[in-house]
Amino acid sequence: MPRVKRGVIARARHKKVLNAAKGYRGRRKNVYRIAKQAVMKAGQYAYRDRRQRKRQFRALWIARINAGAREYGLTYSRFINGLKKSAVEVDRKVLADLAVFDKQAFAKFAELAKSGLAAA
């Protein structure tokens, strides 16, 4: 049975981990055992935060819509309820963008929401 030299595979694996740990501070960037743990933890944070990002953006959009709706005497929940009763289907991302950058268009949505609430 021939002799197996394992240097190539081990070096490739170490290189992959150490390249992923570029930019880390201290021994995390150049000691394989520590870098491996740091890279694994970074992966866990990345996985978790990809899901949290969606929640955080939705919360931001809701806060912006709420602030915009209150300028027209509506709360967020009444504003959304009014739009639903008016059969307006605009997502929160677009509404938040309008609330910040296009006040006139948002005002029209606020009027639609008020008319939807009054009709019901």
From Swiss-Prot:
Domain of life according to the entry: Bacteria
InterPro entries, per database record: Ribosomal_bL20, RIBOSOMAL_L20_CS, Ribosomal_protein_bL20_C
Cited PROSITE patterns: RIBOSOMAL_L20
GO CC annotations on file: ribonucleoprotein complex; ribosome
Protein's recorded name: Large ribosomal subunit protein bL20
Organism lineage string: Bacteria, Pseudomonadati, Pseudomonadota, Betaproteobacteria, Nitrosomonadales
Keywords per UniProt: Ribonucleoprotein, Ribosomal protein, RNA-binding, rRNA-binding
NCBIfam families: rplT_bact
Originating gene: rplT
GO annotation (BP), single: translation
Free-text function comment from the UniProt entry: Binds directly to 23S ribosomal RNA and is necessary for the in vitro assembly process of the 50S ribosomal subunit. It is not involved in the protein synthesizing functions of that subunit.
Family: Belongs to the bacterial ribosomal protein bL20 family.
Species this protein is from: Methylobacillus flagellatus (strain ATCC 51484 / DSM 6875 / VKM B-1610 / KT)
